[in-house]
């Protein structure tokens, strides 16, 4: 029974980190592309656009870090293992 729980935990950890990285990865790509496009259209707003971009990228990256925390909890502090 413990081997099944361990195997399921490893699979769940892989899915957690993989799925947690898909959304923010796509979002970061779109945000960076739109920021470059906005700076190209209005070069005088570069500082404001860059600041907003960096803040939004940090929030998006936090989602991936939450997935990493869940994966590490499943691997090393598994509440289902006795």
Curated annotation (Swiss-Prot):
The chain crosses the membrane at residues 4-24, 57-77. The lineage of its organism: Eukaryota, Sar, Stramenopiles, Ochrophyta, Bacillariophyta. Signal peptide: none annotated. F-type ATPases have 2 components, F(1) - the catalytic core - and F(0) - the membrane proton channel. F(1) has five subunits: alpha(3), beta(3), gamma(1), delta(1), epsilon(1). F(0) has four main subunits: a(1), b(1), b'(1) and c(10-14). The alpha and beta chains form an alternating ring which encloses part of the gamma chain. F(1) is attached to F(0) by a central stalk formed by the gamma and epsilon chains, while a peripheral stalk is formed by the delta, b and b' chains. PANTHER family: ATP SYNTHASE LIPID-BINDING PROTEIN, MITOCHONDRIAL, ATPASE PROTEIN 9. The keyword DNA repair does not apply. GO terms for molecular function: lipid binding; proton-transporting ATP synthase activity, rotational mechanism. GO terms for cellular component: chloroplast thylakoid membrane; proton-transporting ATP synthase complex; proton-transporting two-sector ATPase complex, proton-transporting domain. Keywords: ATP synthesis, CF(0), Chloroplast, Hydrogen ion transport, Ion transport, Lipid-binding, Membrane, Plastid, Thylakoid, Transmembrane, Transmembrane helix, Transport. InterPro entries: ATP_synth_csu_bac/chlpt (IPR005953), ATP_synth_F0_csu (IPR000454), ATP_synth_F0_csu_DDCD_BS (IPR020537), ATP_synth_F0_csu_sf (IPR038662), ATPase_proteolipid_c-like_dom (IPR002379), F/V-ATP_Csub_sf (IPR035921). It is a multi-pass membrane protein. Its main location: plastid. It is found in: Plastid, Chloroplast thylakoid membrane. NCBIfam families: ATP_synt_c, PRK07354.1. This is ATP synthase subunit c, chloroplastic. It comes from the Eukaryota. Belongs to the ATPase C chain family. Pfam families: ATP-synt_C (PF00137). F(1)F(0) ATP synthase produces ATP from ADP in the presence of a proton or sodium gradient. F-type ATPases consist of two structural domains, F(1) containing the extramembraneous catalytic core and F(0) containing the membrane proton channel, linked together by a central stalk and a peripheral stalk. During catalysis, ATP synthesis in the catalytic domain of F(1) is coupled via a rotary mechanism of the central stalk subunits to proton translocation. In plastids the F-type ATPase is also known as CF(1)CF(0). The record marks 61 as: Reversibly protonated during proton transport.
């Amino acid at each position: 029974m413990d081997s099944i729980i361990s195997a399921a935990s490893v699979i769940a950890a892989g899915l957690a980190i993989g799925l947690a990285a898909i959304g923010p990865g796509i979002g970061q790509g779109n945000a960076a592309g739109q920021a470059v496009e906005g700076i190209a259209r209005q070069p005088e707003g570069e500082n404001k656009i860059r600041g907003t971009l960096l803040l939004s990228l940090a929030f998006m990256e936090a989602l991936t870090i939450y997935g990493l925390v869940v994966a590490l909890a499943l691997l090393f502090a598994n509440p289902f293992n006795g």
